[in-house]
Amino acid sequence: MAGQSSRFPNTRPKWMLTHPSTNRFMVTESILGLNLDFFDQIYFVCLQDHQDKYMFLDGFLRELEDVGLYEKSKVAFLPEKTRSQSETVYQLIKSENIEGFIFIKDSDGFFKCNLDDTKNQVAYFDLNDLDNINARTKSYLQLDVNNVVTNIVEKRVISSTFCVGGYGFEDALEFCDTYEKFKDLSQECYVSHIIFEMMLFGSSFYGTKTTQFKDWGTLTEWNKFKREHKCLFVDIDGTIVTNSSIHFPPYVGTGEPLQGNIDFLNELRDSDKVAIVLTTSRPESMREATIREMKRIGMGFDSLIMGLPHCERIVINDFANSNPYPSCRAINLPRNSDKLREFFE
């Protein structure tokens, strides 16, 4: 969070970008795959310059309260950019007098794992379980039969297991002592350098297997992730059920389910990547009847907009680097056709 976000040009700092399904900050989502009850305190380390420019703090604290993390969270501000994640952690430990076990988590990725031990550890995932990944941007580790890390290397593929941006250190002070050996180096000091140095002097690190890894490390990867998520505005009459009317038969509530469309839309929604907003020109007075009808035919949805004018509908949405063009599109489906799947790209 205190880095340069150089791989996210012309956007807010990457950790402030909005998650496409929850509308939370990227950084908030990045930690929700961990069993956070394991920790007594959660520190978010930011630049004072980011607060001065974006005034994010009040909104961030409200968000932390919404997800139940406010009481154990602290936002720490640094006066200037650090040269590495290691330096950021070092400065935090020193300024907050942190002792004992620490777990360092990248803000630009997500994974699930259960932490139940305060030993030295490295969270990892396997290349064979991913379809697409920029392998050259990762650090890699080798494990022996006892799950002990025997080697860790930055930006070079030495095995199929790579670090996912989660590192546990049994002793925060040992981390600092090791970092001080590197702090005057001209190049960036990666956390993997700290780990390798500690291993050379006798410390053991263990692998912590993770699931559901999501890589948000570059703007390209983030936008690719965002494109997997959709918000569909779906008209009811003629799309979900055969066209019905409040004025003449077939009356509202008597339309036949367009089962092919219903099944397809429910599949999308069940992926947890698609939100469905049903729209209709039916009057607000028919909301409860419409909800009962959707329940009866098994159509899942997230929101329902009633009372729209019966005319051409146009979606207007902004686009930007963080929400690239095209940020919206439309599908014109023949009335009462149940072939929506064929029109959906």
Question: Where do the protein language model's features map onto the residues?
Answer:
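Conserved N-terminal catalytic core of the sugar/cofactor nucleotidyltransferase
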Residues: 7, 21-100
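Conserved alpha/beta core of the MobA/IspD/sugar-nucleotide pyrophosphorylase nucleotidyltransferase superfamily
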Residues: 160-229
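HAD-like aspartate-dependent phosphatase fold
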Residues: 229-345
